[in-house]
Design a protein with these regions (language model features):
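Cell wall/extracellular polymer interaction/catalysis modules
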Residues: 1-80, 94
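Exported/periplasmic cell-wall-interacting domains
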Residues: 19, 51-59, 69, 80-160
Length: 160
């Protein structure tokens, strides 16, 4: 079983007191997601982020949450890599080989689905890299833990 580097294992860390509990902050450069606990503490998780030019930036909210989500490539993904994504255009049921992994939190802005997600991955070796089509990937065990903590409506801010 693959072990992520120790710096990407979830860890409680100190943060500024001003960060409200229950919010998520993602810093793409060092590949970290912070779930704010309040009182100057957060849980820091290692993540994979979008490849150059594909990152989500700014603020959103968790619009919905799904266990073992189904997946369908976006039209932009199919156009960018037709040989890879074309055969999957009709989508894929949830399960251990699904690109969204064990859980997905769907990011919404202004009441609309952005098509970006915080989700698990069947490829944990990608954590710490900028390789996705823009989503925030987490180790399945880590995203399951975060999913249990985060309510629909939680604010998410991504800094690049």
């Amino acid at each position: 079983r693959y072990q992520v580097p120790s710096r990407f294992v979830p860890k409680v860390v100190r943060v500024k007191q001003s960060f409200p509990a229950g919010e998520i902050y993602i810093v793409t450069g060092p590949h970290y997601l912070y779930y704010m606990l309040g009182e100057g503490q957060a849980i820091r998780y290692g993540v994979a982020v979008g490849a150059e030019g594909l990152n989500f930036r700014g603020s959103a909210m968790v619009g919905r949450k799904v266990e073992w989500p189904s997946w369908r490539p976006t039209q932009a993904m199919i156009e960018r890599e037709p040989e890879k994504y074309g055969p999957l255009a009709d989508g894929m049921e949830g399960g251990p080989n699904n690109p969204l992994g064990a859980r997905a939190m769907y990011l919404y802005r202004d009441g609309r689905d952005t098509a970006y997600r915080i989700h698990g991955t069947p490829q944990p070796w990608t954590i710490g890299r900028s390789v996705s089509s823009g989503c925030i990937r987490m180790v399945n065990d880590h995203v399951i833990e975060l999913y249990e903590r985060v309510p629909v409506g939680a604010r998410v801010t991504v800094y690049s």
